[in-house]
């Protein structure tokens, strides 16, 4: 039984404990704290236990828990991570972008996106920006990201996967499209505004089930906007990351102003079917720990694995879910 010598565990009852019993209790607590510290140290070193045994658990400062992994036989199919040298930057194989963080509990991965731009569009035209493919077990999180466009006389669109080519006119049908418009004239620029509501900057929700995306720009040079705002920008980023400033509408290289690209949150699943169907996968069933459970994800087809109530760790590894101590429950 764990003993916690704190108000959290005992309240003011310590005032009524005899001196001898109190000293014994304090001694027992010190011994327990020593053993707990040692255990915590082992668990800290064993954050490597979140990786597959014998495999690297980090690339730079980013922890790489299984089913992700670095090197042969260290990852589940579709979750390979490259660790670039000498910078030690983890690269997610499915998108080819830097990996910032992996969250096992929520089934999320933060990657570094880029900012698409189109400059000096002198007539009504559509320009394609840079695209990022997000494949197989990954999807752009609709609840954790937002689509942003910056510029004057700009309409930006974000399109999902190309589903069907249209033979008659050479066009395509996309899985989903979101758009927002940004209009600003030089004489009404307010250098104090930080609002992203359509004057120089606009934001909108992204389409559902977005696995790959391509930014488009429509610019019709309204009121000679090209003279003072030559470029239009668009990007998907983690909600709350971006703060608009009016100077961005006149920038000719917004990416350089931020140094690195915006963070983008991906949802990932262990499989694309349902929990019921996944249990027929046999040896390839990913929730292999005895104290794990399968959970159908709410935001699209697929499932992921969680440790059962009272356990924590990595449900994708045998023995990966460990029992939580009584003190851990009290702290939570």
Pin down the residues of each PLM region.
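Typically disulfide-stabilized, N-glycosylated extracellular/lumenal ectodomains of secreted
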Residues: 2-332
């Amino acid at each position: 039984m764990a003993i916690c010598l704190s108000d959290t565990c005992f309240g003011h009852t310590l005032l009524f404990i005899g001196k001898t019993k109190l000293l014994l209790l304090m001694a027992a607590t010190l011994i327990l704290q020593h053993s707990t510290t040692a255990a915590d140290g082992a668990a800290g070193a064993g954050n490597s236990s979140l990786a597959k045994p014998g495999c690297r658990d980090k690339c730079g400062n980013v922890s790489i828990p299984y089913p992700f992994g670095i090197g042969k036989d260290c990852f589940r199919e579709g979750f390979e991570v490259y660790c670039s040298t000498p910078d030690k930057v983890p690269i997610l194989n499915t998108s080819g972008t830097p990996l910032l963080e992996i969250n096992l509990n929520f089934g999320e991965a933060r990657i570094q996106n880029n900012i698409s731009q189109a400059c000096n569009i002198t007539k009504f035209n559509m320009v394609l920006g840079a695209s990022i493919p997000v494949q197989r077990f990954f999807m752009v999180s609709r609840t954790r990201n937002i689509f942003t466009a910056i510029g004057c006389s700009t309409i930006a669109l974000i399109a999902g996967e190309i589903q069907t080519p249209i033979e008659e006119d050479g066009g395509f049908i996309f899985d989903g499209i979101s758009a927002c418009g940004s209009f600003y004239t030089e004489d009404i620029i307010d250098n104090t505004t930080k609002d992203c509501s359509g004057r120089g900057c606009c934001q909108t929700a992204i389409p559902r089930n977005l696995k790959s995306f391509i930014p488009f720009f429509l610019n019709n040079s309204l009121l000679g906007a090209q003279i003072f705002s030559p470029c239009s920008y668009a990007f998907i980023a983690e909600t709350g990351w971006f703060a608009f400033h009016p100077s961005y509408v006149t920038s000719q290289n917004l990416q350089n102003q931020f140094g690195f690209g915006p963070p983008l949150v991906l949802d990932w699943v262990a499989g694309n079917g349902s929990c019921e169907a996944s249990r027929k996968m046999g040896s390839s069933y990913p929730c292999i720990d005895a104290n794990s459970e399968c959970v159908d994800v709410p935001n699209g087809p697929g499932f992921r694995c969680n440790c059962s109530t009272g356990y924590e760790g990595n449900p994708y590894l045998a023995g990966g879910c460990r029992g939580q101590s009584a003190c851990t429950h009290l702290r939570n």
